[in-house]
Amino acid sequence: VFADASARERLNAIVHPAVMADFDRWCAGHAEDDYTVFESAILFDAGLDGGFDVTVAVVAPLALRLERTCRRDSASPDEVERRIAAQMSDDELVERADYTLVNINRDDLAADVSELDRRFRISKSERDATD
């Protein structure tokens, strides 16, 4: 489906409503949590970003993405490149997201995620104080 935009749209029209309904049910059981996270490589592409307070882009250099995805999925570089080509560019993703994390190595990413967690918890505390 990555090479066929029409087939991808038909598939997304089936999958995305079910995924969002499942996420809504999951969130109902976590209403007291400080915040919840929804992971999606195609959040903006699918037009799902409107239902979220904050968006976070996670990007990495193309060569590293290719290497990681080929290894993870046992896929060829050509197949992975087709997937990436079917998605929004990193430049547009970063432009649209509220925050951006760069995933080059685990230690730096973990530190950046911890900082983002701290910010989200402070924001939650500030919202609670005004309620």
Kindly label every feature range from the protein language model.
Residues 2, 6, 60, 74, ...:
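Residues in soluble alpha-helical coiled-coils and helical-bundle/repeat scaffolds
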Residues 7-10, 39, 54, 82, ...:
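Residue-level recognition of specific faces of alpha-helices
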Residues 21-29, 35-71:
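ATP-dependent NMP and nucleoside kinases share a basic, alpha-helical "lid"
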Residues 11, 55-56, 65, 80, ...:
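Hydrophobic packing within well-folded, soluble alpha/beta domains
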